[in-house]
Design a protein with these regions (language model features):
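Active-site beta->alpha N-cap acidic-glycine motif
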Residues: 49-142, 146-149, 157, 161, ...
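Catalytic grooves of carbohydrate-active enzymes
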Residues: 231-267
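His/Asp/Glu-enriched short active-site or ligand-binding loop at hydrolase and phosphoryl-transfer sites
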Residues: 187-229, 261-273
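Acidic-and-aromatic substrate-binding clefts and catalytic sites of carbohydrate-active enzymes
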Residues: 91-95, 116-125, 149-153, 182-188, ...
Length: 274
């Protein structure tokens, strides 16, 4: 019976997603629609994490958090376990930001968004996204203000990119992103890391697997990447840029559930720094 209910839920999720975002395109609708029509002024949750309506495992307890590893970029979750960190970058397309946020709200999946504040999607979707940020279900990380190759910039420009985005996140969402920053294109070096460290961004956060959707690709290829990289202790990168990924949400959630993976934010895994 529970399996039938879950299948009905995912079926309605798929139908609503298609109805909302339509066929794949590279432009944003003048009035973006969510794929599940719910009030945007819902209060943030507090206390214990509510059970997932699709049977996803809850995040680990606070007592399970571990110290951040030192000595370089973070690419996987240390140790053995059942954790999956789905991390999503940029925010080019407001519809995709909205759809991923609604997916999290509807399923209980936990995610980390690495934000480029230059994109309007982060203010367009503020009312929907902020309660999930405040509850800790979605974490925000610093991906720089405008997505430059940091290794091509002067130290002052690197500082400007990180500080401007940091200030945007604090002003808009009331949260800081430290210590996690993701260098655009994964490109960083000692000089970049030194500037970031001075600002409190001590953890360059890369990945162990990718949905490869920074550019427009097919739904079939995204499903192939999900199958390959949704594995225990992985940090997977995806992008909030193009619509095909929004058409495969039911399969994405099914893979997480069927493999008994536990979606986590980075803050769910690691002890917070002072």
């Amino acid at each position: 019976m529970e399996e039938m209910k879950r299948r009905r839920f995912l079926g309605s999720l798929a139908a609503a997603t298609v109805a909302a975002v339509g066929t794949a395109r590279l432009i944003v609708d003048p009035q973006p629609r969510t794929f599940a029509q719910v009030p945007l002024d819902a209060a943030p949750t507090s206390g214990p994490v509510a059970p997932s309506p699709v049977g996803l495992l809850p995040p680990p307890p606070l007592s399970a958090r571990i110290p951040l590893p030192g000595g370089g970029a973070l690419t996987t979750i240390p140790g053995d376990g059942d954790l999956l960190a789905l991390t999503l970058d940029d925010g080019v397309n407001s519809d995709v930001v909205r759809a991923y946020t609604q997916l999290a709200k509807d399923t209980g999946a936990r995610m980390t968004f690495f934000v480029n504040g230059i994109y309007n999607s982060w203010t367009d979707n503020l009312d929907l996204l902020r309660p999930l940020v405040e509850s800790g279900q979605i974490q925000l990380g610093n991906h720089t203000w405008s997505h430059p190759d940091l290794t091509s910039l002067t130290q002052s420009k690197v500082e400007e990119e990180l500080k401007r985005n940091d200030e945007f996140l604090k002003k808009t969402y009331g949260v800081g992103a430290k210590p996690y920053y993701r260098p655009p294109y994964g490109k960083h070096n000692g000089a970049v890391d030194a500037v970031a460290n001075e600002l409190g961004y001590t953890v360059p956060t890369l990945w162990s697997g990718s949905l490869s959707d920074s550019t427009l690709i097919t739904e079939e290829y995204i499903l192939k990447m999900i199958d390959e990289y949704f594995v225990p202790q992985a940090i997977v990168i995806g992008h909030l840029n193009h619509l095909p990924v929004t058409h495969v949400y039911p399969q994405l959630i099914d893979t997480i559930r069927d493999r008994n993976l536990r979606t986590v934010t980075l803050n769910d895994v690691f002890l917070r720094t002072p």
